[in-house]
């Protein structure tokens, strides 16, 4: 029923419905997966001025789904979406610079875009910028700031942040970073243990309790 409803509205020219219909084709929800149909509907919605669709067009170009892979087109459409204030696109531009996709690899430029995304409240931006500060890649190393940003991503419900935190207990990360996370968990009432940088079961339970708590 949802598919028919969005299909009718999309064909009547509603840009939001065009993007929803494209998502259904993209993910194979209520209809057989079809990247080509998805791309066509994303493009129609993007040309109708919908920022989320502009970002989706860019993603299709980046991954070569439903269209030939083209990093220049990906950058163009991510920039259009970013210009319209779509925060995910700010993060995605950072990803293109970090990986050198269609541009010269530039971790400083990547960090600047992650910062813009983070400032706009994008959880992916918080997390990616946290990693730059944690390892001093593209910015001066600042493990405390890395902790603040990683925590922001966690409480804003970024699945990737929760998955990565589960690895942190064994990963070779800065003790200062881990202590900062514990301080923040304690401040928000999720953690009652000692701030020792050791990510044991008690800290991990606190991390899971904090996940998505700002939403």
Language-model features, listed with the residues they occupy:
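Hydrophobic face of amphipathic alpha-helices that form TPR/SEL1-like repeat modules
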Residues: 20-27, 31, 54-63, 90-99, ...
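Short acidic, glycine/serine/threonine-rich helix-capping segments at coil-helix boundaries
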Residues: 175-176, 186-215
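TPR/TPR-like (Sel1-like) alpha-helical repeat modules
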Residues: 112, 127, 131-134, 140-160
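Short coil/turn and helix-start
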Residues: 11, 27-33, 47, 65-69, ...
